[in-house]
Amino acid sequence: MVKVYAPASIGNVSVGFDVLGAAVSPVDGSLLGDCVSVEAADLFSLRNEGRFVSKLPDNPKENIVYQCWELFCQEIGKTVPVAMTLEKNMPIGSGLGSSACSVVAGLMAMNEFCGKPLDDTRLLTLMGELEGRISGSVHYDNVAPCFLGGVQLMLEENGIISQPVPSFDDWLWVMAYPGIKVSTAEARAILPAQYRRQDCISHGRYLAGFIHACHTGQAALAAKLMKDVIAEPYRTKLLPGFAAARQAAEDIGALACGISGSGPTLFSVCNDMTSAQRLADWLRDNYLQNDEGFVHICRLDTTGARQLG
């Protein structure tokens, strides 16, 4: 049997709309992500389990892990009968790369089980294709960090899909999921079709400056440049309590705060555990809206998807 874990990810990381993503894992060692296991069988089957199993589609063929199996078999040119199990630990529509977790774990588990017939670039291409079926357009800002780990910058040139960006080991990423759902398609539809020239210039300056600061080890500058002029000004109306949470993060001393992916999860960067814990407590008391919500203090997951056991 092969079992693969794929970690949560932050799409956009505020400053890089659709071109930047970061994988994260809780500091307490718990798994914030999905697991998919594959074992030999006479016929294909898919079993679902985990905390968020009730959110999955009733029709197995609509399950993204079934589609992983189907696409993988098409790609290698033969049908591989396997029993697959999806452990759905990630809420759907959370802004934590939930679909990416299932896609990455599903395709990587099949590839490992079959003796790695596909290389990482081909596998990542298929992951982007499947992710596109869900969100409506191919983008890699969740699947790339989820699969490869760390902070990834999407390039999509010269046969290169993404490359890693140097990161800051002492940063703590406080992740708060309020327990409500925001559809990626809805969150994209709310964005303007055209942007003001000044916003385009600011976006270019922030993103270029952030990447430069990461490569030159300037943590304070990198954090200061984590600003979103593309999505956040429009998406905050979908996120009750976000403005108050951002203010609380600033008051507590967080270095940066933003929307993870299309929301509703909020992320905040702190450089000491005391501030991170204070902010986590505040978010738990004030940002969560129901029992499905959670807060985790994380670090970057520099490994990405991996086999367990």
Curated annotation (Swiss-Prot):
One of its GO terms (biological process) is threonine biosynthetic process. Its EC number is 2.7.1.39. It catalyses: L-homoserine + ATP = O-phospho-L-homoserine + ADP + H(+). One of its GO terms (cellular component) is cytoplasm. ATP binds at P91, I92, G93, S94, G95, L96, G97, S98, S99, A100, C101. One of its GO terms (molecular function) is homoserine kinase activity. It comes from the Bacteria. The keyword Nucleotide-binding applies. Pathway: Amino-acid biosynthesis; L-threonine biosynthesis; L-threonine from L-aspartate: step 4/5. Keywords: Amino-acid biosynthesis, ATP-binding, Cytoplasm, Kinase, Nucleotide-binding, Threonine biosynthesis, Transferase. It is found in: Cytoplasm. Belongs to the GHMP kinase family. Homoserine kinase subfamily. HAMAP family: Homoser_kinase. Catalyzes the ATP-dependent phosphorylation of L-homoserine to L-homoserine phosphate. This is Homoserine kinase. It comes from Pectobacterium carotovorum subsp. carotovorum (strain PC1).
